[in-house]
């Protein structure tokens, strides 16, 4: 397959933590119930949430789009049976991907207590 786009994003975990604390409704606005359920048992879910937010941003960048091109719930991070993260694309985000000939997504996410990073390749 041909690479159609590459996106990478980094999120400052402390800054993201402050935003979540300042606006508690942000969790439901940004993340799907599946994502919130995944991070719920974690002692500190914020780095994992920051990585999932970075994944959304990286998808936008891989498609050459800016913030607001599609809703936050139209792209989310799921887990494959192996435990590997994978992308779920729906709604307007899926329409935009199809328009660009994108049918395959590759995702890598990582985080520390300081930074969360997502790298996306669109084919």
Regions found by a protein language model. Give the residues of each.
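Core catalytic alpha/beta fold that binds nucleotide/phospho-ligands
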Residues: 1-123
């Amino acid at each position: 397959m041909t690479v159609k786009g590459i996106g990478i994003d980094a999120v400052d975990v402390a800054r993201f933590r402050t935003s979540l604390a300042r606006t508690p409704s942000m969790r439901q606005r940004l993340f799907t119930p599946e994502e919130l359920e995944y991070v719920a048992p974690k002692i500190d879910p914020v780095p994992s949430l920051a990585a999932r937010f970075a994944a959304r941003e990286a998808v936008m960048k891989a498609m050459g789009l800016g913030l607001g091109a599609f809703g936050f719930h139209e792209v989310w991070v799921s887990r494959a049976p192996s435990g590997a993260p994978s992308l779920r694309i729906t709604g307007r985000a899926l329409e935009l991907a199809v328009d660009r000939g994108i049918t395959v997504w590759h995702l890598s996410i990582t985080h520390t207590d300081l930074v969360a990073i997502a790298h996306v390749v669109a084919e």
